[in-house]
């Protein structure tokens, strides 16, 4: 593309993240572009945003972890049958840390709220909730966060 359009500027942002953080970065980029910010200012703001995000995710299915070799297939099958849930987070270097295991949806959602408290979530920054096949859990989390007042999307 640069060969055909050398006047174009390209910035590649590695968020070391997924899901809501990517949506948040896209929203921020769109907002800053709409405000006619300079290219360099937009790049700086996006990098700062990526460095400040926190990612927590809960898994109820171990199928994909088993398929890509992160867990043994038998272990994944048994964990699913036992209604196991794992809570994961992004480490500063972008790796996945599965740091909490429990049985049942309620316990893992409670741990998400507890972790947000431990991370000193201020209730000011938006919380982006995304789900894949578990809208009920997303709604429960949404309602649990509602009293604290963050912008929820």
Segments (PLM) and residue ranges:
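Mixed-charge interfacial surface used for oligomerization/domain docking
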Residues: 1-11, 17-27, 31-153
């Amino acid at each position: 593309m640069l060969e055909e359009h050398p006047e174009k500027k390209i910035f590649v942002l590695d968020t070391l993240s997924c899901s809501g953080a990517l949506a948040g970065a896209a929203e921020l980029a769109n907002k800053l572009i709409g405000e006619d910010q300079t290219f360099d200012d937009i790049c700086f703001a996006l990098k700062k945003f990526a460095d400040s995000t926190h990612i927590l995710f809960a898994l109820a299915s171990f199928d994909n972890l088993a398929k890509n070799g992160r867990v043994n297939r038998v272990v994944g099958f048994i964990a699913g049958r036992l209604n196991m849930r794992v809570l994961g987070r992004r480490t500063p270097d972008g790796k996945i840390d599965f740091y909490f295991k429990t049985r049942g949806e309620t316990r893992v959602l409670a741990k998400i709220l507890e972790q947000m408290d431990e991370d000193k979530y201020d209730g000011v920054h938006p919380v982006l909730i995304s789900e894949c096949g578990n809208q009920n859990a997303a709604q429960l989390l949404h309602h649990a966060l509602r009293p604290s007042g963050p912008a929820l999307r």
